[in-house]
Amino acid sequence: MNDRVLRVLEFNKIKELVKGYAITKSAKEMVLDLKPYDSVYDVKEHLEETKEALDILMRKGNPPFEGLYDVKEAITRAEKGGVLSIEGLLRIGNMLAVTRKLSDFLARKEEEEEHRILEGMREGLIVLRGVESAISKAIVSEDEIADSASDKLYSIRRSLKEKNSSIRDKVNSIVRSNTQYLQDSLYTVRGDRYVIPVKAEYKSQVPGLVHDQSSTGATLFIEPTALVNLNNEIKELMLKERAEIERILAELSVLVYKNIDVIKVNFNIIVELDFIFAKAKYGSDLGGTLPIVNEEGVIDLMDARHPLIPKDKVVSSDIYLGREFSTLLITGPNTGGKTVTLKTTGLIELMGLSGLLIPASENSSISFFEEIFADIGDEQSIEQSLSTFSSHMTNIVRIMEKANNKSFVLFDELGAGTDPTEGAALAISILENLRARGCRIMSTTHYSELKGYALKTENVENASVEFNVETLRPTYRLLIGVPGKSNAFEISRRLGLKDNVIEEAKKVISTESLQFEDLIQSLQEKSIKAENDAREAAILRNDAEKYKNRYKEKFERIESVRDNVYADARREAKQILDSAKEEADAILKNMRDLERMGISSDARRKLEAERGKLRDKISDAEARLQKKKEEQKGEELKKIEVGMEALLPSINQKVIVLSKPDNKGEVQVQAGIMKINVKAKDLRVAKETKEEKKIKKREARLNLRQVDPSIDLRGMDSEEACYTADKYLDDAYVAGRGEVTLVHGKGTGVLRKAINDMLKKHPHVKSHRLGEYGEGGTGVTVVILK
């Protein structure tokens, strides 16, 4: 991808924002080197890794990168066999600790979704507990070795403490006895040796070695003779300490050197994970989504937003290109926000092709392009002595030399800066040439000739940016299929130009041109209304589809439970009948044996006894089956009341009755989070088992202890989250909690809005607010209960 388009579309600003989320210097460098990938496979893989990281962030929070530093320099030194500094070893030790924690963090639990790419990277991490432990035991901070690093160091430092204590006692004694000769009644240290501040005129009164003097020369720092031997002993111990520390550092450096290949691999993986999670964190704060990537030149962006415009000011637009038409001409006045649309499309393409989530709605599509070209703005300099037209044409010539059917070309005010007639003709010729090559093209223009060109040319479409004449400002909403209107007369009138001047101007323009402009305005108004209607219809359609899928899933789940219950009953019935059949076969065999023996009176008695046994077995089997059926059904309800608990045998689950029987004999019941209609005659009396009674009593006694101060609603849809939060708030209210926290995550804000709407109507809620810094920010809602 050419560097010019990255600069013109301000992709470097995006990289600076992403860099702010990276921790290590190496990961920050990876971000700054980021640019569109060369193959569609690479684009999809890097987008997928970003989406996986975002999913983990939403489910588990931030990865454990605490204490991580860039250790590239330390690794380079260790590879050469050099002795590492205390700081270098500490940072490698911290990196190994992060390796261990990351390995645990990325390990997938059975119930969690698979993250193919990140789990594959996790498998490359090798935990070096021995090296990590040896470093953490020996090093306390970036400039301190622990006493416990070795027995010898411990012994040396203990001796140092004793000697320092002795010399302090001695020097304090000397200070007290020579107060009249001293500048201050304090001792100090010069060159690791204890000295006292003696007035220059009394230096002969305090025998010893002069180590330093004050800037004025009035004070001499003298080491009293009585301290020389003690200072020498301390100096020797300090030299031994230094030698032992160097030995420990050398020993740890050798340990690192022996494992340097593994350490290097671990660091490279961690840097890449740091880079990936930086992309995901930026995408999360941006409200970005995973785009669908195609190779057909199709761009379909829904609710696309420019990522560098603040969220409270940016206006989203639907931008599409590549299916019905390959060239989009955005027409209208120069102040109409056309360039913003152009840059939004190009920048979103660059972001997606670089593995970043895009600021658009779910299921938006981008196309893989080998090159994106842009001629936007005036980039000529005074030194070059180029006019606006010459500057643009220089760029266009370069584009024409390289563009092909795998290119996306962006033109801002194509043909501007010269005679309008010649400029329009030249613009049409350039567009035709690039269209013949199969390029995808977006261009802005204010030439009327290009509006007509788009209207009569196949695969070329007009578009405009909606303009509010009342406020004299663009709304920045893109209207595809409607050419732009100049609005020159309306704007001039709003700014105070006299009507007679405007009317004179209209006379200069042909009637056909005025009618054409009026037609455009009418089209604009109709298009805006149609677009608004389409948006509302799409929202309703999506909601209907969502509810349809949700209830279809619930129905299938109920059907599955019912089928399982029936299957279990059939299996048990078959077992009873098989057992009875086996016993009956045995009895019949005995009867046949008796008949072969002859019919004596004794034999007849035995035969009748066996027949009796057979009848009893069959009756017993029938009774057991009937009893099982009755047990499964339970006792019928004599009376149905709203709010009562009942048993629904078809799903073998207790339900709550929500309505009286209707004219079909059906009632609505709630089973868990599901609401379903069933026949009233199918409901049975719900009986509590002893165990359930015990649990209820225990819950009543321990209610306060069991209601947590917060609940995590992330991962749920709005309906399930509201139901769960409602039940939780009831429990918290009964338990007497005054304040609770609902964790809904930041995400797109849909879940937060649903929770907020529910809280406004909840009977137990006194007030609620978003979390503050340290509480979870906008990812949580703090609720004050009545």
From Swiss-Prot:
Coiled coil: none annotated. InterPro entries: DNA_mismatch_repair_MutS_C, DNA_mismatch_repair_MutS_core, DNA_mismatch_repair_MutS_sf, MSSS, MutS, MutS2, P-loop_NTPase, Smr_dom. ATP binds at residues 332-339. One of its GO terms (molecular function) is mismatched DNA binding. It is an enzyme of class 3 (hydrolase). GO terms for biological process: mismatch repair; negative regulation of DNA recombination; rescue of stalled ribosome. Keywords: ATP-binding, DNA-binding, Endonuclease, Hydrolase, Nuclease, Nucleotide-binding, RNA-binding, rRNA-binding. HAMAP family: MutS2. The gene is mutS2. Homodimer. Binds to stalled ribosomes, contacting rRNA. Endonuclease that is involved in the suppression of homologous recombination and thus may have a key role in the control of bacterial genetic diversity. Acts as a ribosome collision sensor, splitting the ribosome into its 2 subunits. Detects stalled/collided 70S ribosomes which it binds and splits by an ATP-hydrolysis driven conformational change. Acts upstream of the ribosome quality control system (RQC), a ribosome-associated complex that mediates the extraction of incompletely synthesized nascent chains from stalled ribosomes and their subsequent degradation. Probably generates substrates for RQC. The keyword RNA-binding applies. SMART domains: MUTSac, MUTSd, SMR. The keyword Transmembrane does not apply. This is Endonuclease MutS2. Belongs to the DNA mismatch repair MutS family. MutS2 subfamily. Its EC number is 3.1.-.-, 3.6.4.-. SUPFAM superfamilies: DNA repair protein MutS, domain III, P-loop containing nucleoside triphosphate hydrolases, SMR domain-like. Residues 711-786 form the Smr domain. It holds the Pfam family MSSS.
